[in-house]
Structures are given as structure tokens and as C-alpha cells.
Amino acid sequence: DSVGSTTAHKQQNINHLLDK
């Protein structure tokens, strides 16, 4: 699902920012 991929991408981006 495109929506699922987008959500996963956003979540990964947030995780990256949090890790920083």
C-alpha cells in the first residue's frame, strides 16, 4: 500500500530526528 509506505517513511524520519 502506498499509504503504508508513506507512513513508514515518515515514522522512520521521526525516529531519525529523535535519535539525533
From Swiss-Prot:
Entry GO MF terms: oxygen carrier activity
Cellular localisation: Secreted, Extracellular space
Source superkingdom: Eukaryota
The keyword Transport appears for this protein: yes
Swiss-Prot/TrEMBL keywords: Copper, Oxygen transport, Secreted, Transport
Tissue specificity: Hemolymph.
Keyword Secreted: yes
Record GO cellular component, one term: extracellular region
Disordered as annotated region, ranges: 1-20
Function text: Hemocyanins are copper-containing oxygen carriers occurring freely dissolved in the hemolymph of many mollusks and arthropods.
The protein's assembly and partners: Composed of 3 major subunits (IB, II and III) and 1 minor subunit (IA) which form homohexamers and heterohexamers. May also form larger structures.
Family the entry assigns: Belongs to the tyrosinase family. Hemocyanin subfamily.
Protein name: Hemocyanin subunit Ib
Organism: Panulirus japonicus
